[in-house]
UniProtKB/Swiss-Prot annotation:
Located at the top of the head of the 30S subunit, it contacts several helices of the 16S rRNA. In the 70S ribosome it contacts the 23S rRNA (bridge B1a) and protein L5 of the 50S subunit (bridge B1b), connecting the 2 subunits; these bridges are implicated in subunit movement. Contacts the tRNAs in the A and P-sites. Pfam families: Ribosomal_S13. This is Small ribosomal subunit protein uS13. One of its GO terms (cellular component) is small ribosomal subunit. PROSITE patterns: RIBOSOMAL_S13_1, RIBOSOMAL_S13_2. It comes from Pseudothermotoga lettingae (strain ATCC BAA-301 / DSM 14385 / NBRC 107922 / TMO). InterPro entries: Rbsml_uS13_C, Ribosomal_uS13, Ribosomal_uS13-like_H2TH, Ribosomal_uS13_bac-type, Ribosomal_uS13_CS.
Amino acid sequence: MARIVGVELPGNKKCFVALTYLYGVGRTRAFEILKNTGINPDKRVKDLTDEEVSKITKFIQDHYKVEGELRTDINRNIKRLIDIGCYRGFRHKLGLPVRGQRTRSNARTRKGPRPSRIKTKKKKEQTV
């Protein structure tokens, strides 16, 4: 198993699949990284040499934001939107969809589960 940017990549996977385990790297970016470093995408991670691993690591660090740095940037951007009080920041703060989706009938993921209603049973009047 190779360690790239602080993440252990599974050794039995092909390089392009294993690189997608990094936060911020999808299939397209993985192929781009391997193309620029000159490594065969179908090569297994366990077959990579130390030199190839360091090549990939250096390329990623020089050209992309991944893992913690990317997460920090995203959180900082959301916090900035909230601080300036814009509409998008307000939607983030309320936990509602930010990009104009409807909320009357959908958006359950963002809004969370429906509030449960408390059902009260009526006492039956006893006739004596």
